[in-house]
Regions:
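Extracytoplasmic gate region of multi-pass secondary transporters
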Residues: 29-33, 220-249
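C-terminal ends and interior cores of transmembrane alpha-helices
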Residues: 84-97
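Intracellular juxtamembrane helix-capping segments at the cytosolic ends
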Residues: 117-130
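Flexible cytoplasmic inter-helical loops of multi-pass small-molecule transporters
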Residues: 193-211
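Single conserved hydrophobic/aromatic residue that forms the stacking wall/gate
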Residues: 248-256
Length: 256
């Protein structure tokens, strides 16, 4: 038991990083936009709505996922997130081209919620195991989120060129679902909060504050953090599709 407790923090950090590398959809949407428009018959405005719905449900899911992991533990929230995210990938791959208007419901909503359920469960669990080194835990998980955009961009562009059975955006969705399911499932099963004795020991001698959500909303620190995130996030999320379109990172139609 003692050996497991010594190795579990690193296992949880590694599992969380592996999951996050596969779940950076909001930051990587630019590489999906043009192929999704062409395959499902969506206009540029329609593809923008698909992205907007994804982001909206990512935000909603972060709140719901946070409450789920607080009440039922990180494993519970992460397993639900895995099911929703993989379900979104598989549903998008199977969606008939003439039913493109359903793309929002079969992909944007479950993928947004699934990605969001995974994020707080991983981040919170890692920080609890690394109470004295929260910066390390946050940095590793955050770095994996950054790498996710690069990984998904390369993966989708390769799928659009075609390799083996993976052909086009549908093949990319099938393959992402097939890869994400075992990785996120195995990683989610490893997530577990540390024993209470460990938390108490690491927190001893420190004045820790545990506020309710309503108390948190009344603090200046919360609104400063929220404002910083609100002003910094658009650079990644809103400009991603525009940047990809204007730098021709997506492939032209005749090359698919």
């Amino acid at each position: 038991m003692h050996e497991m407790q010594k190795t579990r923090p690193w296992a949880i950090l590694a599992a969380g990083a592996a999951i996050q590398v596969l779940t950076g959809l909001p930051a990587a949407w630019g590489v999906f936009q043009r192929p999704v428009m062409e395959e499902y018959g969506l206009s540029e405005q329609g593809a923008g709505y698909a992205f907007g719905v994804l982001i909206a449900f990512f935000g909603i899911g972060c709140v719901i996922g946070g409450f789920l992991q607080d009440k039922h533990g990180p494993r519970f929230a992460a397993l639900w997130g895995t099911g929703l995210l993989c379900g979104g990938f598989f549903a998008a791959a199977a969606l008939p081209a003439e039913k493109g208007s359903a793309f929002f419901g079969v992909f944007s909503i479950p993928a947004g919620l699934g990605t969001a359920f995974l994020y707080p469960s991983i981040q919170s669990c890692a920080q609890k195991w690394y109470k004295g080194r929260k910066g390390l835990a946050t940095g590793v998980i955050g770095g994996a989120v950054g790498l996710s955009g690069a990984f998904l961009t390369v993966f989708v562009r390769t799928a659009l060129r075609g390799f083996g059975p993976v052909q086009g955006i549908r093949g990319a969705f099938w393959a992402l679902g097939a890869i994400t399911l075992p990785v996120c499932l195995a990683g989610s099963l490893l997530l577990q909060d540390p024993p209470e004795s460990r938390q108490n020991q690491q927190g001893s001698g420190k004045n820790e504050i545990d506020l309710s959500p309503w108390q948190m909303l009344k603090t200046k620190q919360y609104w400063l953090c929220a404002g910083a995130v609100c002003f910094s996030t658009p650079a990644v999320l809103l400009f991603s599709p525009i940047t990809v379109s204007y730098t021709h990172l997506t492939l032209p139609t005749n090359s698919l």
